[in-house]
């Protein structure tokens, strides 16, 4: 018993550090394959500001592989744009991304295996001006620099793009962003990718959300240095909610909204049917009752369609 106790104490630090999901294809991994039907669309435009191949070099030579357009469209693992140390890319979309149930979008890098991980911070904006960063965590030891082609354990990485190999996206959930008056989580228009640099030198290193220096392959002093952005796939798209011409939202009361368990509908018109849809259009509930039970639905945004003899109207509801 004493021997087992001491063994547990010896292993505990490594157990605590390996606390996030594993590489793509392993049990429990959150990686999403590029052809997963979850993806509704892909980034349509991109702008890139390159960083240097080596941020500490006396002569500045920028990363140069690929062009911004390579970051648009579906992931393919080969058509990429390299950002260099601290380089950035800003992506926009045909439709905004919305804060739905679970992950809302995913970022793809082109790593050739599960351990050579070039990482990036991810930020989102609803106006293209004010960006807010997803809380990222890196538990990789900073005692030794990860070399130019060194290995990183994916289970020590969370909310950093580049966690998985090529063709597998790192998912991001908008609900994890901080609440702010300048951020409309239901209508994200821009996603920014920022290379983490990777050096453990505090003069140039970058910090995660809890103050850890992010240690990833460094130096990457070649043309494809830094994060290699392949694509950004959209899972939850924003849907404009419009009333039909002959019905007005003032004719209805829907409460409570947001709700924990049910919504009640009061109407001036006789209600024929009520449908509840996921934000992506999947019909989840059909009812003729004015009280709709949502207890079995996960937290997120939904569309409530009310049908009367005069027409129909759709309203967004939020399940907490």
What residue ranges belong to the model's regions?
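Surface-exposed loop/edge segments in extracytoplasmic proteins
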Residues: 128-135, 282-287
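Exposed beta-strand and adjacent loop surfaces of beta-rich binding modules
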Residues: 15, 104, 117-121, 270-274, ...
């Amino acid at each position: 018993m004493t021997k087992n106790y001491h063994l547990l104490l010896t292993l505990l630090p490594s157990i605590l550090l390996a606390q996030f999901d594993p590489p793509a294809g392993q049990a429990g991994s959150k990686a999403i394959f590029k052809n997963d039907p979850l993806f509704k669309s892909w980034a349509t435009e991109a702008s890139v500001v390159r960083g240097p191949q080596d941020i500490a070099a006396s002569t500045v030579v920028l990363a140069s592989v690929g062009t911004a357009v390579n970051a648009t469209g579906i992931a393919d693992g080969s058509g990429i744009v390299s950002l260099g140390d601290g380089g950035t890319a800003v992506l926009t979309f045909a439709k905004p991304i919305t804060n739905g149930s679970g992950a809302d979008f995913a970022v793809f890098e082109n790593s050739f295996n599960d351990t050579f991980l070039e990482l990036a911070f991810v930020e989102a904006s609803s106006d293209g001006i004010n960006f807010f960063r997803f809380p990222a965590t890196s538990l990789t030891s900073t005692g030794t620099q990860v070399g130019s082609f060194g290995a990183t354990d994916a289970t020590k990485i969370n909310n950093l793009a580049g966690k998985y190999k090529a063709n597998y996206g790192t998912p991001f959930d908008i609900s994890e962003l901080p609440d702010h008056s300048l951020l409309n989580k239901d209508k994200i228009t821009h996603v920014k990718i920022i290379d983490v640099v990777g050096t453990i030198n505090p003069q140039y290193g970058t910090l995660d959300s809890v103050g850890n220096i992010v240690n990833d392959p460094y130096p990457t002093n070649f043309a494809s240095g830094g994060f290699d952005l392949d694509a950004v796939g959209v899972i939850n798209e924003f849907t404009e909610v419009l009333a039909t011409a002959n019905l007005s939202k003032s004719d209805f009361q829907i409460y409570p909204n947001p709700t924990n368990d049910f919504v009640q509908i009061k109407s001036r018109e006789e209600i024929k049917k009520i449908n509840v849809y996921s934000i992506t259009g999947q019909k989840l509930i059909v009812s003729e009752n004015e009280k709709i039970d949502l207890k079995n639905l996960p937290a997120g945004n939904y569309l409530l369609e009310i049908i009367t003899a005069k027409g129909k109207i759709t309203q967004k509801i939020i399940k907490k």
